[in-house]
Amino acid sequence: MTGVQITGCFSSRSNETKPESGERPTPASASGKRVLLAYFSRPGENYSYGGRTNLKTGNAEVLARMIGGYIECDVHRIEAADPYSDDYDATVARNVREQDADARPAIANPLASTDGYEVVLLASPIWNVRAPMIMSTFAERYDFRGRTVHPVTTYAMSGLGAAERDYAASCPGATIGEGLAVRGEEVRKADAEVRSWLRRIRLLQD
């Protein structure tokens, strides 16, 4: 795949690379299945315990990096063609407009293909009970029939929110597998929760 932001995994031994056309996706170590971890994350001003905090790295990216540290997978960061503001209130207002319009925000760096992946992990924050609308843009762009899609979310109050329902609608023919929801304020201490979930969905062995 040329011109695609893909990494083998998040780890100290891996740098961001762009596989050449025809390169096969990385096999997962435990299941033998090929796994794509696609995530959207927003740094900047974020909600935290009823207040605000400025994050250099968004919570969903922290969670994606944690997952990528435990399994072999290809990782794709979804970038908005029109980047979201670092300002919390501005992002909230934009998200409300996008939800009300059932918008599909453009992606700056779409993958050329998701062929070859058997398991897809879709990671994002939950905004107003739903994954950001750009996740629907991504999910609807590809044919996930016959694949297993696992929602992965960071949240303030809503857990997985409507992510399972939305991905079921966006990914016809896919199996929506067990999701993982981690409170944003606690994501940096979620190692045990992440490992337990990866074992349950059989991507990590004891």
Predicted region positions:
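N-terminal export leaders
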Residues: M1-T2, I6
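N-terminal beta1-alpha1-beta2 submodule of the flavodoxin-like/Rossmannoid cofactor-binding fold
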Residues: G8-Y117, V129, R199-Q205
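Structural beta-sheet core signal
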Residues: L37-Y39, V75, L122, P151-T153, ...
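Solvent-exposed loop/turn segments at secondary-structure junctions
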Residues: R42-E45, A80-S85, I126-R130, Y155-L160, ...
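Short, surface-exposed alpha-helical segments at coil->helix boundaries
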Residues: T57, E61, R65, P132, ...
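Structured segments of extracytoplasmic/periplasmic soluble domains
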Residues: L63-Y70, D74, A123, T137-Y142, ...
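Helix-loop-strand module that forms the ligand-binding subsite of alpha/beta enzymes
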Residues: Y88-P172
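Glycine-rich phosphate/pyrophosphate-binding loop and the adjoining helix
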Residues: T175-D206
